[in-house]
Amino acid sequence: MAMRTHYCGLVTEALMGQTVTLCGWVNRRRDHGGVIFIDVRDREGYVQVVCDPDRAATFAVAENLRNEFCVQVTGLVRARPEGTTNDQLKSGKIEVLCHELKVLNPSVTPPFLLDDDNLSETTRLTHRVLDLRRPAMQRNMMLRYKVTMETRKFLDANGFIDIETPMLGKSTPEGARDYLVPSRVHDGSFFALPQSPQLFKQLLMVAGYDRYYQIVKCFRDEDLRADRQPEFTQIDIETSFLAEEEIREMFEGMIRNVFRNAAGIDLPVFPTMTYGDAMFKYGSDKPDLRVKLEFTELTELMKRVEFKVFSNAATMQGGRVVALRVPGGGAEGGLSRGEIDAYQEFVKIYGAKGLAYIKVNDAAAGREGLQSPIVKNLDDASLAEIIARTGARNGDILFFGADKEKIVNDAIGALRVKIGHSAFGKKSGLFDDRWAPLWVVDFPMFEFDEEGQRWSAVHHPFTAPKDGHEDLMDTAPEKCIAKAYDMVLNGIEMGGGSVRIHREEVQSKVFRALKISAEDAQLKFGFLLDALQYGAPPHGGIAIGLDRLVMLMTGAESIRDVIAFPKTQRAQDLLTQAPSPVDEKQLRELHIRLRNVQQPA
């Protein structure tokens, strides 16, 4: 006899009159007038089991059941009595009349009820095994599996092969901090866990494996946020002999296919926007296009005004002044004084010193129709031009950002999203509840690192410049555009990629632009430079964050809800208590001595 014939959640009226054997966990036990009802749960859902006192032995076992007991049930599938069906369940039209009931393993009293939606994250992560039994988490894990399965099916159908790359590699401290692994055999030397298989997948292209993929763990020792983990999973892909547009077309098709087949979601065609346009209109390289608000550029206009807050920002090197028009925000029933005050505090998180605003009571009345502490500091012509450029109407409110470009983009860009997602924004039609995908292209090749006083790569130093931009690396690196692209969905970067450098002389030129000496480049990347000299093909690829992808599909607030055993924001595993101290003997074998850190008095 089989230990199990069916999953609990898949027992339907199609099995009516048949005897089934089920295994699962007691979700709830109810005693109704001498008859005991048990909801038994497994990964597919619930089934209602009925224990009748006529079967004394079975009934005696049922009387002693408690939540989370692991049980085996054999019984007859029959229709539920009229009026007791549950349309929310696949098994909601049937019940199982219990013939045999066996406790496979009892359970101690759980520390929480699995249907408690108000648990702290600490409690959930400490008791992660129980948390993973919750139906919502089971759905998340099953969807994650479906996403990886559909990804593999698509890539296999398109000729990609799954090749594993090393977990123990060389540390290249140009990006985020590495997780280091000390070598016992090579005293004083360290491996690094991969932040990405970037260089290995490029080497595979040189080796002739023209379509590679891997669903792979990556590691970064960085400060954590809601959408970051020290170890994360990415869908890593590289291909030879495809142009940038062909790469984007292929992997847009893959993502649309995965959403449709794994989650029943039809994504629209991905529009394309340049990095410059995204920053100009939205202050972000991953704009949330569901929010119907855009910046109005005012930098040139504000150069001539006497109001120093605006004119100083407009005339400083790298300064910017923008307005954000919020339709209806200044009208009766619009943004309250408290909300405006809260937004003024909110932008300070991003380095803004404050948030100037103008309420438009009567756009046609000039100065008299405007309400704001700053109106007195602006001349009539400038006020009229602000109204004209923003297209402001009666009842609108205008918010202003004036500072260094990065601060303005970050602060007003975040404000735009916050207002759009607010109750006011949704009520006022400023938020379009839809799937809003996007390709952002034509990123700058370099950005200037003020602290290090040198140029650094925006994506990574292996990204190819756009055709005709190679010489700009020497003469005007700030104007050099990369063949890089990011895949954005609902304001979240799902993945990014680029066409890679496939010629050694261009790669060496990039290293020089980044002030990496020839000796240093040979020491850190000599294996790549050597490989590029052996007829390396044109190639490019993309890496898509699996955790973020599933988080978006499920609507989860954090990627911790779509990872089976995640770390906290302090990079700890509360279930296993990792990281933890190790024995002195282990440290000696690894040639490591811990410094005694003095505790502050």
Curated annotation (Swiss-Prot):
High-level lineage: Bacteria, Pseudomonadati, Pseudomonadota, Betaproteobacteria, Burkholderiales
Positions contributing to ATP binding: 220-222, 229, 493, 545-548
Main location: cytoplasm
First-tier enzyme category under EC: ligase
Entry keywords, A to Z: Aminoacyl-tRNA synthetase, ATP-binding, Cytoplasm, Ligase, Nucleotide-binding, Protein biosynthesis
Chain segments carrying region Aspartate: 198-201
Record localization: Cytoplasm
SUPFAM superfamilies documented for this protein: Class II aaRS and biotin synthetases, GAD domain-like, Nucleic acid-binding proteins
UniProt keyword annotation of ATP-binding present: yes
Gene Ontology MF annotations: aspartate-tRNA ligase activity; aspartate-tRNA(Asn) ligase activity; ATP binding; nucleic acid binding
GO cellular component, one term: cytoplasm
Subunit structure of this chain's protein: Homodimer.
Similarity remark: Belongs to the class-II aminoacyl-tRNA synthetase family. Type 1 subfamily.
Function: Aspartyl-tRNA synthetase with relaxed tRNA specificity since it is able to aspartylate not only its cognate tRNA(Asp) but also tRNA(Asn). Reaction proceeds in two steps: L-aspartate is first activated by ATP to form Asp-AMP and then transferred to the acceptor end of tRNA(Asp/Asn).
Gene Ontology BP terms: aspartyl-tRNA aminoacylation
Entries under NCBIfam families matching the protein: aspS_bact (TIGR00459), PRK00476.1 (NF001750)
Site features described as Important for tRNA non-discrimination, chain residue numbers: 32, 83
Reactions the enzyme catalyzes: tRNA(Asx) + L-aspartate + ATP = L-aspartyl-tRNA(Asx) + AMP + diphosphate
Name listed for the protein in its UniProt record: Aspartate--tRNA(Asp/Asn) ligase
InterPro entries noted in UniProt: Aa-tRNA-synt_II, aa-tRNA-synth_II, aa-tRNA-synth_II/BPL/LPL, Asp-tRNA-ligase_1, Asp-tRNA-ligase_1_N, Asp/Asn-tRNA-synth_IIb, AspRS_core, GAD-like_sf
Sites where the protein binds L-aspartate: 174, 220, 459, 500
UniProt-listed Enzyme Commission number(s): 6.1.1.23
